[in-house]
């Protein structure tokens, strides 16, 4: 009897297991409706003559989920915006520089809280600006602590960067450390001879810190920065079209630059002779903070590596724990002066990325997900990595001034859908 009862119980359990519904997979963020919404948005930007050309690429759960390109990369000559169009990525150069720096971190070459002076005596005995006297002479005090590598990674070093600091801005202009004829070593020596604008670690201020990161890569590795970046980041990722210099044979697909006057509603194509001067010549200075060009596919390979916790298609560029470190907020609450960073939303700052630390507080803020990390460029380009939804997005355009039409917010809304106060995009 026991045998039959056991058999019956086993059959009942097996039937119940077979009939139990499989767990429901989360719906993708980018389905047909989302793709149509993105298409409509990008087309509207072109139709309304707010941009000449625009393209976007989204990967989700390891697959291409969206690609679209609209308008012209060169409106005057009728060249369409395409997947292989080359654009100036400006400050989206910075995360690539940070990645190069962190490959050295992984070898034990430095610690984040090491002082710069451990590797670069150019930054010894620095003074800090406190104002000017009645005669306009700068007033200075000693640094309370040395600049650390963490400071240059999160923009708290104190390097001057603005044209409106009495006395200090004039000294910065005279030293001209970012002149493209300088080498990185000459640049560092000139910054080291200038006063800092504020005490290291006291506030967040966007500036030349990532250019100093490039110098540190060169100093610690013993290789020219361009070569190190190529060997340790670009080549392993197959980013063959991410370069400081665009050769003659590729210039036909190198996008023109445009300037929008939102009030007048006019979109002007800028002369290549000025807009592309950085990329049409070989200059001594390889800036870590900007200067690279890239194709949409190339930059997505970088974003996918980050989404893959440091690995793309079996090639490891960074360890998972290093990517996590870079995508962690490194700004303590004591750093309350943060310039325009709060305009990016509920964010802190990691190692060359903004890091979302809270959901959007209102529909007016940029949409996004806690844990995402991102950055953008002066010509209105954008990328982000969303580990929560296993999603990465890249938006390419060449538009000055920086995002005058809220295209970043609108693109994020198109990807994630309307803002809701109760749930993050992709949450159940």
List PLM regions with ranges.
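Sec-dependent signal peptide recognition
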Residues: 2-7
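C-terminal motif of bacterial Sec signal peptides marking the signal peptidase cleavage site
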Residues: 15-16
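Short, conserved catalytic-motif segment at the N-terminal edge
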Residues: 28-87, 111, 125-132, 405, ...
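Short active-site loop at a secondary-structure junction
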Residues: 47-55, 76-149, 198-209, 287-290
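Structural recognition of the beta-strand scaffold that forms the well-ordered cores
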Residues: 55-57, 88, 151-154, 205, ...
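A generic structural motif
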Residues: 71-73, 274, 399
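Short, surface-exposed beta-strand/loop micro-motifs that present aromatic residues
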Residues: 372, 379-389
